[in-house]
Structure formats: structure tokens, C-alpha cells
Amino acid sequence: MVKETTYYDVLGVKPNATQEELKKAYRKLALKYHPDKNPNEGEKFKQISQAYEVLADSKKRELYDKGGEQAIKEGGAGGGFGSPMDIFDMFFGGGGRMQRERRGKNVVHQLSVTLEDLYNGATRKLALQKNVICDKCEGRGGKKGAVECCPNCRGTGMQIRIHQIGPGMVQQIQSVCMECQGHGERISPKDRCKSCNGRKIVREKKILEVHIDKGMKDGQKITFHGEGDQEPGLEPGDIIIVLDQKDHAVFTRRGEDLFMCMDIQLVEALCGFQKPISTLDNRTIVITSHPGQIVKHGDIKCVLNEGMPIYRRPYEKGRLIIEFKVNFPENGFLSPDKLSLLEKLLPERKEVEETDEMDQVELVDFDPNQERRRHYNGEAYEDDEHHPRGGVQCQTS
């Protein structure tokens, strides 16, 4: 039992979520609310990052489950939170803040794919927007010699203010220079490049051809090195494509295996059957249960080499795992005469010798809501005992 569920609610998962479920939830939400895509959702992005940072760490998660957010803030497991952008970059392969300072930003894009795409392989063309160095000014932002050191911050890009917080006590506050927006240099408006307006970069449309190999998995990353955002003086970042698999109507993927449920009738469970299955590469395979091979409700069987292709070994495949659900006939489907005949064909049932000490009882259908109603009525009854309702008072003379 967890103390609170706030972090789980932020990620939209249950408290018993697996690490894979946490990763999938974070991936979708982080891409949706990233500041580059949603500039007004900075606080939401921060909450998502904090929730994932705690729940992805087994020690922090255990501490949170026992003591809630307060236990994390008190530092019982290395308290405090990392930068949301660092968490994002580490998750998507960006390398963290130090590497980000030497390179342009990575562009991360989620690509929706089907299970058929991952089974057969596919090629998709994807149009993206990215920053490129302005070719008109060659990334200077203006005319040659027009760029000058910002006199306000002396080229550091940062301002330092001293704030007195008490007698003999001062606080040093560092913030981005408003004059140069943190660049450490400025360009006179008349000398700015007309193409990029002094920003040194422009937005450009990029068409990528994304090759999805057989056996790739949900959440797998395809990286286009050096194709990300460009910035003057920095190496270009990467474009990272993250595969997001849609749910399939029939099959569920479990590693290299495919899992499915199959309904069969009672006669098929007892007497055998043949069932066709349409595969993800548009073949039809037929599974056979021979007469005399009893298939019980909940039995699990498999077909070898009919699962997912193994990544980079596409001629090898996992298993197709099938769980059988036996559908029983409705009450009264046989007349008494035929029922008697069926009984003679089936294995003999064990008769119970009744004694006088035994009580005869009757089976009825179970109603799961009945207990809830009884529980509710019981609470209401107890409440009446503790807080009697006021009735009409008899007048006494």
C-alpha cells in the first residue's frame, strides 16, 4: 500500500507499474510537453521529469511509496531533483548538460508504427523543422565587424546583482543578461542580418527517410547523427526518432514472442479442432488439436518460429503463444434424454453418499455488487446508531 499516488498520477500509471510501463509513460508525456513543443507547459514538464526521476530509481521509489513526496524532499535517498532537461537528454541519449554545452540541441521526434511495421520492416518519410546556421551572414548575425561585446555583462552573458537580505547579510543573484539575452554580444539593429534578424540561425524543413528494421521494438531509438539543431561554434546535435507502437487487435508482443487468446467451443476442446490464424506478414497458418487431445480452459500452447523476427537476425523468430478460452454451452442446451446419453460417454462422476448430518444447499449465481450493497447498507446502519436521525417529537403537556 503506497502512502500517496501523486507521482504515479502525473505519469498516468498504477502504483504497481513495471519499469517498462514507467518508461513508456515518461517517453510519451516528455515528448508531448517538452518546452520546444509546448513553451507554456514548463511546469508540467518539470512535474513529469520529477515523477519519473523518483519512480525509475528503485530506492527512491521505495522511499516514496512509504513516506510520500515529503520523504524524498527530506533527502533520504539523495534528496533533491535533477534538471528536467538533463533527465530528458539522458533518457533519449543526449548525454546531459556538459555534452549539450558543446553541441547543438538534439531534435527528438516520436514516430507512430504498427506491429506489422515492426514485423515486416518499413520505410517512412518524415518532415521535421530544425535550426540551421544562417547562410546569408554565415552565422555571425550581421555584417562583418558589427558584432560587439555586450557592455552590460562584459561578454559573460550573465548579470550578477547583490541583494541585501539583512544587516550585514547580502545575497548574490545571477541571472541571464537582458541586454544580450545571454549571448555575451550584441548587434546594432541597423547592422543585423535581414534573413535571421541577428539570431544567427534560421528554421529549415528537413525530410528524413526512416528505415524501420524487422524486429525493432516499441521505444527503440533511431539516431541520425549530426542532423539535429545547428548553432554557431557548436557541433550539430542529432535527430532522434523514437518508435511508438500502436496496440494490435489480436497480438500482444512480449519480447520476441507474440501472445494471443483464442476462443474454442466445448466440442472442440474435447474432440479436436483446426483453426486458421492470419499472421502479420499476411500468411495463414492452421493449428490443429487432434481428437483425444483435451484442451482445458486456460491452457497455454505455442507454435515455434511464428513470433517476432529477432532484431538483426530476421530469419530467426520467437514463439507464437496461444492461451485458450473454452466457451461452455448455455443452460438447457440438451434435452434430458440427450444429457443422459452424454453422461454415459463422459468419464464417470463420483457420487456422494448423503447422511442425516448433511444439509442440502442450493447454488445460485454470484453477484459481485451484492457484497458492496450489503457493506454500504451496514455502514449506513452503523451511522444511524451513532447519529440517530431527528424525528417528530411528541408534544407533552
Swiss-Prot record:
Membrane-related topology note: Lipid-anchor
Region of interest (Disordered), ranges: 352-397
Biased composition (Acidic residues): 353-365
Lipidation (S-farnesyl cysteine): 394
Short name of one Pfam family: DnaJ_CXXCXGXG
Propeptide residue interval(s): 395-397
Subcellular location(s) of the protein: Membrane; Cytoplasm; Microsome; Mitochondrion
In-chain residues carrying the UniProt-annotated modification Phosphoserine: 83, 335
Protein residues bound to Zn(2+) 2: 150, 153, 177, 180
Tissue: Detected in liver (at protein level).
ZnF CR-type: positions: 121-205
Chain's role: Functions as a co-chaperone for HSPA1B and negatively regulates the translocation of BAX from the cytosol to mitochondria in response to cellular stress, thereby protecting cells against apoptosis. Promotes apoptosis in response to cellular stress mediated by exposure to anisomycin or UV. Stimulates ATP hydrolysis, but not the folding of unfolded proteins mediated by HSPA1A (in vitro). Co-chaperone for HSPA8/Hsc70. Plays a role in protein transport into mitochondria via its role as co-chaperone.
HAMAP family: DnaJ
Protein name, UniProt field: DnaJ homolog subfamily A member 1
